[in-house]
C-alpha cells in the first residue's frame, strides 16, 4: 500500500493485492488506485467485486484494459497529470 497526502490536501492511495485468478480477476490481482481532491475521488482505477477492470475519471466510468501492474500505475499517474493540467 502507498498513500501520500500533499500540502494542498490532495491524496493518492494505491493498493494492490495478489489474489486467486477468477472470471473477474483473470490476471490474479485486485487493485484500487485513487486520486482524491477536496474529499472527492476524481480519478480511480479498480476492479471491485464482480466488476472487471475499469477506471473513473471526473465522475464517469470507463472500461480499462489491464496490461500489468507497471502499466496500470503509469496510466493512473498519466491521468493524474492530465487532470492537474486541465485545471
Predicted regions and their residues:
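Short helix/strand-capping connector loops at secondary-structure junctions
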Residues: 51-64
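Short, compact, well-ordered microdomains
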Residues: 61-87
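The feature represents the first ordered module of a protein
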Residues: 1-54
Amino acid at each position: 500500500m502507498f498513500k501520500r497526502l500533499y500540502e494542498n490536501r490532495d491524496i493518492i492511495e494505491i493498493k494492490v493485492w495478489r489474489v486467486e485468478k477468477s472470471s473477474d480477476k483473470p490476471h490474479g490481482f485486485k487493485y484500487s488506485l485513487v486520486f482524491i481532491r477536496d474529499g472527492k475521488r476524481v480519478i480511480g482505477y479498480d476492479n471491485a467485486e464482480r466488476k472487471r477492470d475499469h477506471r473513473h475519471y471526473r465522475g464517469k466510468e470507463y472500461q480499462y484494459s489491464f496490461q500489468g501492474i507497471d502499466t496500470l500505475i503509469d496510466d493512473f499517474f498519466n491521468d493524474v497529470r492530465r487532470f492537474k493540467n486541465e485545471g
